[in-house]
Amino acid sequence: MKEIALEFLKIINGFGYEAYIVGGFVRDYIMKIQSHDIDITTNATPQELKNIFTNVKFPKNMNDQDCYGSVSIIYKNILFEVTTFREEYAYLDNRHPSSIHYVDDLETDLKRRDFTINAICMDQNGNIIDLLNGKTDLTNKVIKTINNPYKSFTDDALR
């Protein structure tokens, strides 16, 4: 599964975009736990991804996901949840941001995430990228929010 995910990244990178596996899959990989939940973060927009993966089925209605910069792509029978690098603003329903702004910076995108251990990335060569020290927290068995804990949990109640 990891090999197909890295292949998926290479396709996006081949079109001149950055792309990384992020979150639970990378965390579980480091812990040597098998995972089937593959999240990708990229500076490619949903429309640019649709242009890249013209022969790939998008299981969700793109219009529903465009406002959050997320698409689901099935590639080689594996579901990839792909999200454009972004900043989020004001959560009004305790689940979804009222607006987002695409950014071209991985670190800015990672800083909007929930926990440091879920902000660890893997590049197309399998290298671990840990800009927010999530590996240290993982080693020390610490779950630490990236932002103010109260704000993080009230913004998104599913955290």
Identify the function of each model-found stretch.
Residues 1-159:
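Catalytic cores of the polymerase beta-like nucleotidyltransferase superfamily
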